[in-house]
Design a protein with these regions (language model features):
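Extracellular beta-strand-rich, repetitive "passenger/adhesive" scaffolds
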Residues: 1-166
């Protein structure tokens, strides 16, 4: 099945969108998930969007076992969580404080990953990008591969058990 969203679309409080195996969402505008709404992409599910924004906070904003491609920016607002066991490709990921990313497969960025204060990153897969910027009170744990052209860390706790390159 394929769902084409022609413009900016907001998923209101309490909505969970589940993209099943071999299903696809094509969004030409911004997909916004508000409050406790969620996006779950199952294995072999696919979402393509211009922009995607999670304003909901807890519980998990995005759970991905499939493929998520964002042409511009994926935004995680305060309290949002991203669990990735699939593939995420985006120009940038914009993150507010008090958010969390757990990556168990692959995240590829054309631009930057900016880790604000009170942010937690657990990488058990692969993360590639142009620039990694981390600020005070951010915690990054790398158990596999992180490769960026530039890495800038300011008062950041980094637990590196594998390969972190700039």
């Amino acid at each position: 099945a394929k769902w084409t969203i022609p413009a900016t679309f907001q998923f209101q409080n309490g909505i969970e969108i589940i993209v099943m195996n071999n299903a696809k969402i094509e969004a030409s505008g911004t997909m916004t998930f508000i409050r406790n709404s969620m996006l779950t992409i199952m294995e072999k599910g696919e979402v393509n969007a211009e922009d995607i924004s999670f304003t909901n906070g807890a519980p998990a904003a995005l759970r991905n076992w499939g493929a998520l491609t964002v042409a511009n920016t994926m935004t995680l607002h305060s309290g949002a969580t991203l669990y990735n066991k699939g593939t995420i490709t985006s120009k940038n990921i914009s993150i507010n404080s008090n958010t969390k990313i757990v990556n168990d497969n692959k995240i590829s960025l054309e631009g930057e990953l900016n880790l604000p204060s009170n942010f937690s990153l657990e990488n058990n897969g692969e993360i590639y990008g142009e620039k990694l910027i981390a600020n005070s009170d951010a915690v990054a744990t790398n158990n596999n591969i992180m490769k960026f052209t530039t890495i800038s860390l300011t008062n950041t706790t980094v637990n590196n058990a594998c390969s972190m390159e700039a």
